[in-house]
Swiss-Prot record:
EC code: 6.2.1.2, 6.2.1.25
Cofactor requirement: Mg(2+); Mn(2+)
GO terms of molecular function: ATP binding; benzoate-CoA ligase activity; CoA-ligase activity; decanoate-CoA ligase activity; fatty acid ligase activity; fatty-acyl-CoA synthase activity; metal ion binding
Described function: Catalyzes the activation of fatty acids by CoA to produce an acyl-CoA, the first step in fatty acid metabolism. Capable of activating medium-chain fatty acids (e.g. butyric (C4) to decanoic (C10) acids), and certain carboxylate-containing xenobiotics, e.g. benzoate.
Taxonomic lineage of the native organism: Eukaryota, Metazoa, Chordata, Craniata, Vertebrata
Protein residues bound to ATP: 221-229, 359-364, 446, 461, 557
SUPFAM superfamilies named among the record's database cross-references: Acetyl-CoA synthetase-like
Gene3D superfamilies, sorted: 3.30.300.30, N-terminal domain of ligase-like
Gene: ACSM2B
Subcellular location: Mitochondrion
Enzyme class: ligase
Species per Swiss-Prot/TrEMBL record: Homo sapiens
Regulation: Activated by monovalent cations, such as potassium, rubidium or ammonium.
The protein's name in its UniProt record: Acyl-coenzyme A synthetase ACSM2B, mitochondrial
């Protein structure tokens, strides 16, 4: 069996010595994880080696058949599958993809579905069949879809009613696209119906023995700078990395976890598939067609959800409601990542619910990189320490590790040996992949500070840093200060050209409704004074522009690049790099 083969490689980890941890991958094999090394099997497949393990435990009566997936649509319809049912259903999905669709190992499959159970089946089906899945949000328009299908040379797309027209508008311009698979109650010309095929498919599928380093997924980066790139992950960088990080959330096998994320974002697979099912826990999913804080609060009150994971904006939106009307009897773990968690969000959530929010940090390319685990002290404004498989450091422009308390670029050590968890590279873009290496480190493109305890503070995207009169100013510092003022609902801070200082801080501000009638000039002065009062005065925004919305990626991240490029273009000047 491939699990008994000699280990193919070692992944060196750097840092303080920690005791050995042993985690079950399945009943046939133990993987010993130590701070000094990791044993990496030659073959690994999350579906057969993790999911089917829990299914076998259920069949053998060694595990209660509790839900693995619990889905609700908010209108009274619910669905529950235990691990045996999930295993069989995903084998049906694999048979559809490799049988009815005729897809071959290594083919690329775009997946654009809302939060429906079929999303999880299709992803698992791809994993079983050795196909490369490429999740995308249903918010994409035809131009976004065309770019992704052409760039990836996808052989198939699995989509729902929400994007049929958008896909059909551009499908003829995608010569590689052969299969269109529709997840819907209705049929559509040119599309195979997934639900119909699922009813006819066999529940037995021979899982492909995939290599640990074999390509498993492609995620298009969010494009906060430039066009989205194709970040390729392997079976080990997703599945095995999840085994190594398992438990940081505090999740137990008997628990229920709700990850509030768009299905096109990597957070969705990390939280709602890899983390929960690695531990044998239940993934809770709400269809949630649109973000509605009242629906989220009602759901938390009505279902035995123990852990909730989402972006900080989820908590900020919930805090705008009257939380005194809701009780969360089961909720214990609140996790936030994807953007900076403002200290006041943490404080307000704790004050109103009695619960802490534990922050985590990562990227499409690296997965979970830093986190505040269940046993760690929470430091407001800090995103935790390095994940167990990574040596994360703050480095200078030559790749030297900087001492604690010094701002620099955040990097993960990838030499002399590349750690598990790092993506394989940008597809067909080796120059861009190589450009992100500085010395022995992979650059995350973020600025930060590491303190004496190993906690990291996020200072901003490296290309977002503002250099004004010799002062280097991180936009998140100014944004955090502005968000403490009741007039500010959302803000984005960029550099703006200045004839004397080179560049100055400019803030784009979305106002709360009750402040829309205020005098703009007076409110500008008030906000500037406010920033001076809560942070170093040199950071205050010398320019403020009130706007109704901010440019964002399809995953909801503010695109400071667009604001900055427009600002500098209007001035007719080029920004110094």
């Amino acid at each position: 069996m491939h699990w008994l083969r000699k280990v193919q490689g070692l992944c060196t980890l750097w840092g303080t010595q920690m005791s050995s941890r042993t985690l079950y991958i399945n009943s046939r094999q133990l993987v010993s994880l130590q701070w000094g090394h990791q044993e990496v099997p030659a073959k690994f497949n999350f579906a057969s080696d993790v999911l089917d393990h829990w299914a076998d435990m259920e069949k053998a009566g060694k595990r209660l058949p509790s839900p693995a997936l619990w889905w609700v649509n908010g209108k009274g319809k619910e669905l529950m599958w235990n691990f045996r049912e999930l295993s069989e259903n995903s084998q049906q999905a694999a048979n559809i993809l490799s049988g009815a669709c005729g897809l071959q190992r290594g083919d690329r499959v775009a997946v654009m579905l809302p939060r429906v159970p079929e999303w999880w089946l299709v992803i698992l089906g791809c994993i079983r069949a050795g196909l490369i899945f490429m999740p995308g949000t249903i918010q994409m328009k035809s131009t976004d879809i065309l770019y992704r299908l052409q760039m990836s040379k996808a052989k198939a797309i699995v989509a729902g009613d929400e994007v049929i027209q958008e896909v059909d508008t551009v499908a003829s311009e995608c010569p590689s696209l052969r299969i269109k698979l529709l997840v819907s109650e209705k049929s559509c010309d040119g599309w195979l119906n997934f639900k119909k095929l699922l009813n006819e498919a066999s529940t037995t599928h021979h899982c492909v023995e995939t290599g640990s380093q074999e390509a498993s997924a492609i995620y298009f980066t969010s494009g906060t700078s430039g066009l989205p790139k194709m970040a390729e992950h392997s079976y080990s960088s997703l599945g095995l990395k999840a085994k190594m990080d398992a438990g940081w959330t505090g999740l137990q096998a008997s628990d229920i976890m709700w990850t509030i994320s768009d299905t096109g974002w990597i957070l969705n697979i990390l939280g709602s598939l890899l983390e929960s099912w690695t531990l044998g826990a239940c993934t809770f999913v709400h269809l949630l067609p649109k973000f509605d804080p009242l629906v989220i609060l009602k759901t938390l009150s009505s279902y035995p959800i123990k852990s909730m994971m989402g972006a900080p904006i989820v908590y900020r939106m919930l805090l705008q409601q009257d939380l005194s009307s809701y009780k969360f009897p089961h909720l214990q773990n609140c996790l936030a990542g994807g953007e900076s968690l403002l200290p006041e969000t943490l404080e307000n959530w704790r004050a109103q619910t009695g619960l802490d929010i534990r922050e985590f940090y990562g990227q499409t390319e690296t997965g979970l990189t830093c986190m505040v685990s269940k046993t760690m002290k929470i430091k407001p404004g800090y995103m935790g320490t390095a994940a167990s498989c990574y040596d994360v450091q703050v480095i200078d422009d030559k790749g030297n590790v900087l001492p604690p308390g010094t701002e620099g670029d955040i990097g993960i050590r990838v030499k002399p040996i590349r750690p598990i968890g790092i993506f394989s590279g940008y597809v067909e873009n080796p120059d861009k992949t190589a450009a992100n290496i500085r010395g022995d480190f992979w650059l995350l493109g973020d600025r930060g500070i590491k303190d004496e305890d190993g906690y990291f503070q996020f200072m901003g995207r490296a290309d977002d840093i503002i250099n004004s009169s010799g002062y280097r100013i991180g936009p998140s510092e100014v944004e955090n200060a502005l968000m403490k003022h009741p007039a500010v609902v959302e803000t984005a801070v960029i550099s703006s050209p200045d004839p004397v200082r080179g560049e100055v801080v400019k803030a784009f501000v979305i106002l709360a409704s009750q402040f829309l009638s205020h005098d703009p000039e007076q409110l500008t002065k008030e906000l500037q004074q406010h920033v001076k009062s809560v942070t170093a005065p040199y950071k205050y925004p010398r320019k403020i522009e009130f706007v109704l919305n901010l440019p964002k990626t399809v995953t909801g991240k503010i695109q400071r690049t667009k604001l900055r490029d427009k600002e500098w273009k209007m001035s007719g000047k080029a920004r110094a790099q």
